[in-house]
A protein has these predicted regions:
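C-terminal soluble interaction/assembly domains
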Residues: 166-213
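Non-transmembrane alpha-helical segments in soluble domains
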Residues: 27, 125, 156, 160, ...
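Short, charged low-complexity intrinsically disordered segments located at boundaries
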Residues: 51-59, 153-159, 186-193
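Acidic/His-rich structured neighborhood in mature extracellular/periplasmic domains
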Residues: 2-145, 213
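Acidic/His/Gly-enriched intrinsically disordered linker/tail segments
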Residues: 122-183
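Residue-level preference for alpha-helix termini and adjacent loops
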Residues: 8, 58, 62-63, 158, ...
Length: 213
């Protein structure tokens, strides 16, 4: 594992360039936020992908060896391997950093509120990483992203039919918002975390129609 990690991360120029772009844009939007002083690569023993401590970011390179890395079959589920690629590192770092600075706070903790919160994060990530494909930002494959776009109306019909938007039950929230092989509340053909995708669509629609924001 150590040897493979060193090989795959021997050249990190593109990673560094993308991070510089992301944090430069972040500093422009939030000048009071402290930009991380260092980003370290390390082998985590398959325990950590991205960590943030005392203004230092650590990236567990053994968590990004590629979705086809054979050993992953022994330690993670198939659906988790999609995000265990080098291409996902920048999005994971920026997402973790935003979560550290922008806490979720809701009086009722309804599904719609969680959707919109995550949608705002995704929208902001898109502004910070304009060159990243949208599916990479949310951690989908391009095929999963295309499925969501193709069946967007059916997704909404299902959500409204079940009256899920204002539910607060933990099982419902978990099904829509947490990682999994699919979003059980919608269909087994869907990708997981479909609530995050829906939230992003809501925020995108709002921002398109309210350009003064």
């Amino acid at each position: 594992t150590n040897a493979l990690a060193k090989e795959k991360f021997a050249n990190v120029d593109s990673l560094q360039e993308a991070l510089n772009t992301g944090f430069s844009r972040l500093h422009y939007l939030f000048p009071d936020w402290e930009i991380p002083a260092k980003v370290y690569l390390f082998v985590s023993g398959f325990n950590s992908s991205v960590i943030y401590y005392e203004n230092i970011i650590g990236v567990g390179t053994d968590m990004y060896l590629g979705s086809d890395y054979p050993y992953y079959n022994q330690v993670v589920y198939d659906y988790q391997k999609q995000t265990m690629r080098k291409e996902c590192i920048v999005g994971d770092i920026m997402s973790m950093y935003l979560s550290y600075h922008i806490a979720y706070n809701s009086k009722y903790n309804r599904l719609l509120e969680q959707m919109i919160f995550r949608g705002k994060q995704m929208f902001l990530l898109r502004q910070l990483l304009p060159d990243e494909p949208e599916w990479e930002i949310i951690g989908y494959s391009q095929e999963q992203w295309n499925w969501c776009e193709l069946y967007e109306r059916a997704i909404w019909n299902r959500i409204m039919e079940k009256k899920d938007l204002f539910k607060t039950e933990s099982l419902v929230l978990s099904s829509y918002m947490n990682d999994g092989p699919f979003t059980a509340e919608v269909t087994q053909d869907s990708p997981g975390r479909l609530g995050q995708w829906v939230g992003w669509r809501i925020v995108n629609s709002y921002m398109r129609n309210n350009k003064e924001v």
